[in-house]
A protein has these predicted regions:
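Active-site gating loops and adjacent loop-to-helix segments of metal-dependent hydrolytic enzymes
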Residues: 37-71, 175, 193-211, 236-240, ...
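Alpha-helical scaffold segments that flank or form the walls of functional sites
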Residues: 40-93, 99-116, 141-142
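Histidine/acidic residue-rich metal-binding segments in metalloenzymes
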Residues: 12, 104-113, 133-239, 256-278, ...
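Histidine-centered divalent metal-coordination motifs
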Residues: 28-35, 182-184, 214, 281
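Active-site-proximal loop/turn and secondary-structure-junction residues that shape catalytic pockets
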Residues: 96-98, 125-131, 156-158, 185-189, ...
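His/Asp/Glu-enriched, well-ordered alpha-helical/loop segment
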Residues: 199-210, 246, 250, 260-338
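Active-site mouth loops of central-metabolism enzymes
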Residues: 14, 57-73, 122-134, 153-158
Length: 338
């Protein structure tokens, strides 16, 4: 027996887990931005060190010139790669704003129809220009039938974050759509958006319909505060999406905070019975030029970053919880389980 054959016959927990995930239908990528996938260029690499907020504006250069066809090719390439990497469904945020107007959402709808049941694609509106100013608000409202999930980014309506979330919740109550909101992305204790989102979920009676995407800054707070927020999240039945490789690159700071990795505190969330799913976030763009969307990489980083070694819990996170948070829970009974 060769050395390679000997190694292949040994127990490999990651390989065993991946095979099990595949037997349960494959990975679910619960948060991505396929419309911007593979847009990185050598020139853009100069801007990859910019602050997140600066990148929000920088991508206007691409959006302003991208046609429906350009967007479709990005989304199609991303989905084909996801299929190759054994991901079987995804939720992609898609820009709808005065810069790109409806080009990205039109392309996403074409891709949705093109792949059909081969790759169920759930579309969420990305609100990079906020939801409160008249023009962005009008564009989103007029496209309400074209996407399945209301996406939010409260930081884009700075100083009016509560109003931003209120508007999302009002739309959700009118349409019955789920809500996914980017919160606490700066890994800093000055942010308390997860708490705000949970409280607003309860206030609007949308328990079980809202998902917090990222919630990094939660881990930067003292344990007493985290425990308080977890209780509110339980009352709100708030779910979460963790995108490990998207945020592990947060720069070092001199702030004194509890020791933690720059990851969603998934270990603490699951211990308290909160639903957590996994996503890739950006793929080969100015935000994450080296991220390829491979969910096995995301799984590995989650396992080691949060020290979650329970294969049953990990299976739930990458498959079952994924279908639940992107609104495809009805597909769970169709999965082939062994």
């Amino acid at each position: 027996m060769t050395h390679t054959e000997t190694l292949m016959n040994r127990y490999n927990p990651l390989g065993d887990l991946v095979r099990r995930i595949q037997s349960h239908g494959g990975f679910v990528n619960s948060h991505a931005h396929f419309d911007r996938a593979y847009t990185i260029t050598p020139k853009m690499m100069e801007r990859t060190q910019d602050h997140l907020f600066e990148k929000w504006e920088y991508v206007d250069n691409f959006k302003r010139n991208a046609s429906v066809g350009d967007y479709f090719e990005n989304i199609k390439a991303a989905i084909e790669t996801q299929l190759f990497l054994t991901t079987r469904a995804a939720c992609t945020f898609v820009d709808i704003d005065p810069i790109c107007e409806y080009n990205a959402i039109t392309a996403a709808k074409i891709a949705q129809e093109h792949f059909g049941d081969e790759f169920p694609l759930i579309i969420a509106c990305q609100t990079l220009k906020g939801v409160l100013e008249p023009e962005p608000k009008r564009l989103i409202e007029n496209a309400m039938d074209d996407f399945q999930i209301l996406g939010g980014l409260p930081a884009k309506d700075k100083g009016r974050e509560e109003e931003h979330i209120d508007q999302l919740m009002l739309w959700a109550k009118d349409t019955g759509k789920r809500v996914h909101v980017h919160v606490d992305q700066l890994n800093h204790p000055s942010e308390k958006e997860t708490e705000l989102l949970a409280r607003k979920t309860i206030e609007h009676g949308l328990e079980g319909k809202v998902t917090a995407v990222h919630s990094l800054s939660l881990a930067a707070h003292p344990k007493s505060y985290r425990e308080e927020v977890y209780k509110i999240c339980q009352d709100a039945n708030l779910s979460f999406v963790c995108c490990p490789s998207a945020w592990i690159d947060h720069p070092r700071r001199e702030d004194l905070v509890p020791s933690h990795n720059a990851l969603t505190p998934v270990d603490e969330l699951v211990e308290r019975g909160l639903t957590v799913a996994l996503g890739s976030d950006n793929i080969c763009d100015v935000y994450k030029p080296f991220c390829d969307g491979d969910m096995i990489n995301e799984l590995r980083l989650l396992i080691d970053g949060c020290k979650i070694y329970d294969p049953d819990e990990l299976l739930n996170i990458v498959v079952y919880n994924g279908y639940e948070v992107i609104g495809l829970a009805d597909r769970l009974e169709d999965l082939s389980v062994f």
